[in-house]
């Protein structure tokens, strides 16, 4: 027996301690000092659904999509109440997990989390962001374990650092979207996929890790319905890679279909279709804008299939042309595709990359139909989950090429220089933006931070609109997700035409939940090209640009809303103009409202 025990490397301890210190600093800084509130409509929508679940109201929503209401009305063959309206748009896992945390912190109590007069950021926004950030940090840990098993701890450490300093990852982590939950679940799934590949290459039974991977893929599909395309890639791979052939694939397929079956039966009972309102997102990829169809009460007239094939090809090409932004902006990640040409010596590494490629290809096919963009925080951004493992293959391939250079062979000190260069280059977007963001955060720390304005200004909704509108009434708005989340009131997405508006307005009146008014914000006039407003808001164009006309002239005499003959009936119903934030956010009320305490601007 040897008297020597393995020596503890102080360098490793120092490096890991430094990593954890930086990780904690970035986490606390982003969640508290630099946080600007939620800025994604889908994130706010899921958050308010989670709050309803925490209150014991089930999977219900306070954001009413006219298309969803029409579906429910047709399915029930009668008028459907706006209160406790059941949602069929979102996948259930993220709202359920968020609801558990909100229940724990008392997030269902509106009074407990009411904003103070000095606050600019809604307190529950930070809770939502913290949940998403927690999943992001867990994903870093899982990927470190996976990559160190596939390659080595050095490559795993580089990938962990790249993830930590990735601006795109932090953007999604703070958005409240389910992408970080998806990243963690996908990372867990492919960890067990690799374990199964290892077992198969060694002649052992791969059933257990392959099925465990299937469990995580099932959870993944419940976090975002589009991830079924990722699971499809795994099912195809498993059908050929693991013996006995087809057994694992069939088991995984059954695991996915069982919970999916319950969801589809639930959706059918509410909307009359097993895919609920979610299937209408297909219009985003094939027929113009998802927003257009969600805001209409006449679904048959809004599917424009002109140029269908060209739209699919365009989105497919977009995914390849903008592959770097899709892969979180990590410039080395696309080297994964070149590494497919390299003959890795270890069979599991060589086989694993084909599994990743197959899952990525099926995902790209799905997104070609449903649409995706690298700009902003796209809720359909699924390529993001592939970024860490593709980065690992890219770093490994670069390391192989680097190690074969003559000057590197002759100068051992240069052995890890390529890692340093990659980390610096990929971290620059985050590092360069930090000084300005930190400075702004420090200046506004007493007010909780700087809001995501335009178009969102939580105080106007949480402090003013909530006080104006009784809980029993509904609000029409161009940002119903924000009204539902911040004002905690039922909000209907403003239809584009007067006929659709009047149908929903009359339904609300018949249900003793008469609309209190119409809220216009920068979500309509400020986030669109001026030429696009008439096509998106049609009969309500004059109302949408009404506030801007008055701001430009400095007088209410230039109002366009009450001079529009198309809206005469609407003007009579909602004649009182209430500035919630000057005329940047205007509430057209059915009753006169005192507004002396509303600010003129953010």
Task: Label each residue range with its predicted role.
Residues 109-125, 138-165, 183-184, 204:
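Transmembrane-helix signature of polytopic, membrane-embedded enzymes
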Residues 173, 178-182, 187, 220, ...:
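Hydrophobic/aromatic-rich transmembrane helices and adjacent perimembrane loops
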Residues 3-7, 197-199, 229-260, 264-265:
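Perimembrane helix-loop-helix junctions
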Residues 34, 38, 413, 420-482, ...:
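Membrane-embedded, lumen/periplasm-facing catalytic core of multi-pass transferases
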Residues 12-23, 207-215, 231-236, 253-257, ...:
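Signature aromatic-anchored transmembrane alpha helix within multi-pass, membrane-resident enzymes
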Residues 238-239, 313-354, 360:
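Hydrophobic, aromatic-rich transmembrane alpha-helices
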Residues 189-210, 220, 238:
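Membrane-interface transmembrane helices that cradle and orient dolichyl/undecaprenyl
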Residues 158-159, 163, 212-217, 251, ...:
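Transmembrane alpha-helix segments characteristic
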């Amino acid at each position: 027996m040897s008297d020597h025990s393995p020596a503890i490397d102080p360098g490793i301890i120092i490096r890991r301690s430094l990593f954890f210190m930086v990780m904690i600093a970035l986490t606390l800084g982003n969640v508290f000092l630099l946080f600007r509130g939620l800025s994604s409509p889908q994130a706010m929508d899921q958050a308010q659904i989670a709050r309803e679940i925490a209150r014991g109201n089930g999977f219900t929503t306070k954001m009413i999509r006219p298309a969803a209401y029409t579906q429910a009305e047709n399915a029930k063959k009668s008028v459907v109440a706006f209160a406790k309206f059941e949602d069929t748009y979102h996948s259930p896992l993220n709202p359920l997990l968020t609801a558990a945390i909100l229940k724990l912190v008392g997030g269902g109590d509106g009074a407990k989390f009411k904003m103070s007069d000095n606050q600019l950021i809604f307190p529950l926004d930070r809770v939502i962001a913290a949940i998403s950030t927690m999943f992001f940090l867990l994903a870093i840990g899982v990927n470190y374990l996976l990559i160190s098993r596939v390659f080595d701890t050095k490559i795993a450490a580089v990938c962990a650092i790249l993830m930590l300093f990735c601006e795109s990852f932090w953007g999604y982590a703070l958005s409240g979207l389910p992408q970080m939950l998806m990243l963690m679940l996908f990372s867990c799934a492919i960890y067990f996929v690799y374990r199964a590949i290892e077992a198969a290459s060694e002649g052992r039974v791969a059933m257990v890790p392959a099925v465990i991977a299937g469990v995580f893929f099932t959870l993944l599909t419940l976090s975002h319905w589009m991830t079924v395309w990722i699971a499809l890639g795994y099912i195809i791979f498993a059908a050929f890679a693991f013996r006995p052939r087809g057994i694992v694939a069939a088991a995984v397929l059954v695991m996915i279909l069982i919970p999916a079956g319950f969801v589809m039966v639930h959706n059918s009972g509410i909307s009359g279709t097993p895919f609920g309102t979610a299937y209408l997102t297909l219009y985003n990829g094939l027929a113009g804008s998802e927003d257009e169809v969600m805001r209409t009460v006449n679904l048959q007239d809004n599917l424009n299939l002109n140029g269908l094939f060209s739209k699919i090809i365009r989105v497919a090409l977009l995914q390849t042309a903008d592959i770097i932004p899709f892969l979180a902006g990590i410039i080395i990640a696309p080297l994964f595709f070149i590494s497919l040409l390299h003959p890795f010596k270890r069979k599991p590494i060589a086989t694993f990359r084909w599994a990743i490629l197959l899952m990525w290809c099926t995902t790209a096919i799905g997104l070609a139909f449903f649409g995706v963009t690298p700009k902003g925080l796209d809720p359909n951004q699924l390529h993001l989950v592939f970024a860490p493992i593709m980065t690992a293959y890219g770093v490994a391939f670069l390391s192989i090429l680097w190690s074969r250079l003559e000057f590197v062979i002759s100068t051992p000190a240069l052995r890890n220089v390529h890692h340093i260069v990659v980390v610096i280059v990929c971290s620059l977007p985050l590092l360069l933006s930090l000084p300005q963001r930190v400075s702004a955060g420090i200046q506004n720390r007493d007010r909780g931070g700087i809001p995501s304005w335009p178009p969102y200004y939580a105080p106007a909704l949480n402090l003013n609109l909530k006080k104006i509108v009784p809980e029993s009434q509904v609000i029409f708005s161009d940002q119903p997700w924000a009204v539902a989340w911040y004002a905690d009131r039922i909000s209907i997405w403003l239809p584009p035409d007067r006929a659709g508006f009047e149908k929903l307005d009359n339904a609300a009146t018949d249900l003793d939940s008469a609309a209190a008014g119409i809220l216009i914000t920068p979500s309509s006039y400020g986030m669109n090209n001026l030429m696009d407003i008439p096509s998106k808001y049609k009969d309500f164009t004059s109302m949408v640009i009404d506030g801007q006309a008055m701001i430009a002239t400095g007088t209410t005499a230039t109002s366009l809303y009450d001079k529009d003959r198309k809206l005469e009936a609407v003007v009579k119903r909602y004649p009182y103009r209430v500035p919630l934030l000057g005329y940047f956010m205007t509430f057209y009320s059915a009753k006169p409202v005192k507004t002396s305490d509303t600010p003129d601007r953010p």
